[in-house]
Curated annotation (Swiss-Prot):
Catalytically driven reaction(s): a 2'-deoxyribonucleoside 5'-diphosphate + ATP = a 2'-deoxyribonucleoside 5'-triphosphate + ADP; a ribonucleoside 5'-diphosphate + ATP = a ribonucleoside 5'-triphosphate + ADP
GO CC terms, sorted: cytoplasm
Protein name in UniProt: Nucleoside diphosphate kinase
Gene that encodes it: ndk
Active site (UniProt): 115 (pros-phosphohistidine intermediate)
Organism classification: Bacteria, Pseudomonadati, Chlorobiota, Chlorobiia, Chlorobiales
Any one GO molecular-function label of the UniProt entry: metal ion binding
Amino acid sequence: MERTLAILKPDCVRKNLIGAAIEKIQSAGFKVVAMKMTRLTKETAGEFYAVHKARPFYGELVEFMSSGACVPLMLEKENAVADFRTLIGATDPAEAAEGTIRKLYADSKGENIVHGSDSVENAKIECGFFFSTQEAVANMA
């Protein structure tokens, strides 16, 4: 079973859409194996998004991700990484497919509700960034 990391970003939390987003995620067949609410410091957000450090949006991304609480989730499903990317939609909600999480709930490319790992390799790294092995509950169903 494959795992991926999702982060319900500060705009999702501020707009009180945590439940709606998790409902969409679970309805798509994902199992939540770890979840917590946290607030990233600028340093922690910068470390998590270090891969984007040279990109022009890096500073804004770090500011945004440290602007309020967020909810990291470790999700499990066959083909989890690719399926979750499909479920959340394009980074820019204006370009996202109908019915995707970003199309339904996001306001802009910068505040787009949710993060999803972009590869199986990055999913492993990202899950480890937020969760210990002990925090991940094996799916017993």
